[in-house]
Curated annotation (Swiss-Prot):
It is found in: Cytoplasm, Nucleoid. This is Nucleoid-associated protein P9215_00191. The keyword tRNA processing does not apply. GO terms for molecular function: DNA binding. It comes from Prochlorococcus marinus (strain MIT 9215). Its main location: cytoplasm.
């Protein structure tokens, strides 16, 4: 520590370098998540949906033979596919954020920042 309880200039410079690197890595991660296509399928694979790593809906694929099913079955399949895609996307985002923030002990809500 330098005088007046402040870190020395070298430590401060290093902290700014780390902060800048984290900012660059975070932007790269944001771009990567935005360009991902994560698939979710209904249990019978009649409905498939794709969302980005940021959980934005991208596309839907419906097997033609499900269109003859009753309304409740179609709704159930759509919901299953959306839930699975969302779960995969959320897991992927958390893993990537942990990779970015691991070891920094930022204690971000919703993210496991431990070094386990």
């Amino acid at each position: 520590m330098a005088g007046f309880g402040l870190p020395n200039f070298g430590q401060l410079t290093e902290a700014f370098k780390k902060a800048k690197q984290i900012q660059q890595d975070a932007q790269k991660l944001q771009d990567e998540l935005e360009n991902m296509e994560i698939e979710g399928k209904s249990d019978d694979e009649m409905i498939k949906v794709w969302i980005s790593g940021n959980q934005l809906p991208l596309k839907v694929e419906v097997q033609e033979n499900i269109l003859n099913a009753d309304k409740e079955k179609i709704e159930k399949n759509i919901l299953q596919a959306i839930q699975k895609a969302h779960e995969s996307s959320t897991t992927t985002m958390k893993e990537r954020m942990n990779d970015l923030t691991g070891g920094l002990n930022l204690n971000l809500p919703g993210f496991d920042n431990s070094d386990s």
